[in-house]
A protein has these predicted regions:
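Rossmann-like S-adenosyl-L-methionine
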Residues: 2-11, 19, 218, 222-405
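Short, acidic/hydrophobic/Gly-rich beta-strand patch recurrent on exposed beta strands
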Residues: 23-28, 145-148, 212-214, 343
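Short, conserved phosphate/pyrophosphate- and ester-handling motifs at nucleotide-, phospho-/glycolipid
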Residues: 40, 163, 286
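Extended interfacial segments that mediate partner engagement and assembly in macromolecular machines
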Residues: 60-72, 78-185, 205, 220
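Flexible loop/N-cap segments at domain edges
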Residues: 198
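Structural signature of eukaryotic scaffold interfaces centered on beta-propeller domains
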Residues: 201-203
């Protein structure tokens, strides 16, 4: 087996792809990852990094393109790290995701079950209802956009195809306010400067907009002028919030939220229910796909109206309340206090008297239900990205529900 070195030129055949858009080739038994290459392609590459377990190569040219390769419709791709697969047609992207799920089930989970086809979205542009623009200074001026892949270097963008159009005017208004009043962007190297992120939530059904400015200070300077600039940027802004975040690190939001205009929340409709959304509240970013997901969850739960349902990681109660309409009792459990406050409010404003919410972890929930002699018939889990922890799995097993969704 020949040894690969940084700078080596190669021609490789791409066999598969990772979920983040890197093609996978094999050279003398060694796995080589090629960002931007698609399965089935023959490519000219140069070795960029040789690690202990993997080799990474730079794509120089595509010698034999895949039938699924398309011209990217975004001028910032692939420099911007927001999207990974804009060079692949959408149907093939769905197939890739299905293959990835199947691989996780088989390779990691040791399961022989087959993954169902991925349900694609009818709308693939302008669908996100949340935007997070990191802010930096470049060449003496503030810019906002998205981090380049695996870096903290901001790629300035004028328009992002997957964000709502209102985000462009809001971003522009904040940057103009910063320039006019000489308000510096945050520098994570020196921990100086002010503005860290421009954070936007958009109600897909209501049209309401929440703007949150995250800054490295306890008191935001020129906040009245900021409010005026944002309100002049266009209609729809319902509330403007300031979140101080003076900690080092890459956490976006702070722990405090001070309304500068409005009450700090917006309202949106999902699956025919009304939800109050604060800046830190979890809410699926693709509204249309979230409705399809939740409707499927209710269908899989097979509710007849006589069941007690437990929703772990319930967030603001979106899934819990969807389930409550079809169950005898729905219990939501979430460890974030603000989310539970929103969930209780959402239950009340939707008249859901059979929904109950608790701020605790899953292990505590299992003990509480046991003490109350309550056994859930159905448990629904929609965990954060890191997945369901081992102790939560043990708690679910101990509760012995008839169905887990």
């Amino acid at each position: 087996m020949s040894e690969l070195h940084r700078g080596d030129p190669l021609q490789v055949s791409i066999e598969t792809a990772t979920i983040d858009g890197s093609g996978v080739a094999r050279v003398d038994g060694q796995v080589v990852f090629v960002p931007g290459a698609l399965p089935g392609e023959r490519c000219s590459v140069r070795i960029a990094h040789v690690g202990r377990s993997a080799v990474f190569a730079q794509l120089l040219s595509v010698l034999t393109p895949s039938a699924h390769r398309v011209e990217p419709d975004c001028p910032y791709f692939p420099l911007c790290g927001g999207c990974a697969l804009r060079h692949m047609d959408y149907e093939q992207e769905l197939a890739l995701k299905q293959t990835h799920v199947q691989s996780c089930l088989t390779r990691i989970g040791g399961q022989t079950i087959s993954a169902l086809p991925i349900t694609g979205a009818a709308q693939t542009d302008g669908y996100r209802n949340k935007v997070q623009f990191p802010v930096q200074e470049q060449d003496g001026r503030p810019v906002a956009g998205f981090f380049s892949g695996k870096t903290h270097r901001v790629i300035p963008v004028r328009h992002c195809r997957i964000q709502p159009d209102c985000a462009d005017a809001i971003r522009g208004a904040v940057l103009a306010w910063m320039e006019q009043y000489h308000i510096r962007a945050y520098d994570e190297q020196t921990h100086t400067g002010y503005i860290r992120h421009i954070y936007i939530r958009f109600g897909a059904e209501s049209g309401q907009i929440l703007v949150c400015i995250v800054a490295n200070c306890a008191q935001l300077p020129k906040k009245k002028q900021l409010v005026a600039a944002l309100l002049a940027a266009g209609p729809g802004i319902t509330t403007i919030v300031f979140s101080p975040n003076t900690k080092k690190g890459n956490t976006v939001l702070g722990t405090e939220f001070h309304p500068l205009y409005g009450d700090g929340t917006i309202t949106d409709m999902l699956c025919g229910l009304q939800f109050r959304l604060s800046a830190p509240a979890f809410y699926q970013v693709n509204h249309a796909q979230a409705e399809r997901l939740y409707e499927k969850a209710v269908q899989l739960a097979g509710l007849t109206g006589n069941e007690t349902v437990l929703d772990l990681y319930c967030g603001t109660g979106t899934i819990t309340l969807c389930l409550a309409r079809h169950a005898k009792k729905a219990i939501g459990v979430e460890i974030v206090p603000q989310a539970i406050e929103d969930a209780k409010f959402n239950a009340a404003q939707n008249g859901m008297e059979n929904a109950e919410f608790f701020c605790m972890d899953a292990g505590q929930a299992a003990k509480m239900l046991a003490d109350r002699r309550t056994r859930p018939d159905v448990i629904v889990v929609d965990p954060p990205r890191k997945g369901v922890s081992a102790d939560v799995i043990e708690a679910i097993s101990a509760m012995a529900p008839q169905c887990v969704v």
